[in-house]
Amino acid sequence: MAVPKRKTTPSKRGMRRAHDALSSPVYIEDKDSGELRRPHHVDLKSGMYRGRQILEPKDD
């Protein structure tokens, strides 16, 4: 069974955990509609992606 030879210091533990934080999702303003949407994702209201119609727009 593997056992640590030395105690991990709080500094080393913190450096290891430095990349574990969760980041909030990024939103951009759509050029055509002005709505917020995720980058590199289809705009669900208009159904457009990169200037092309991908989905049928929602009629609410």
Swiss-Prot record:
Residues 1-16 have a biased composition (Basic residues). Residues 1-34 are annotated as: Disordered. One of its GO terms (cellular component) is large ribosomal subunit. Pfam families: Ribosomal_L32p. SUPFAM superfamilies: Zn-binding ribosomal proteins. Keywords: Ribonucleoprotein, Ribosomal protein. The keyword Magnesium does not apply. GO terms for molecular function: structural constituent of ribosome. One of its GO terms (biological process) is translation. HAMAP family: Ribosomal_bL32. This is Large ribosomal subunit protein bL32. It comes from Maricaulis maris (strain MCS10) (Caulobacter maris).
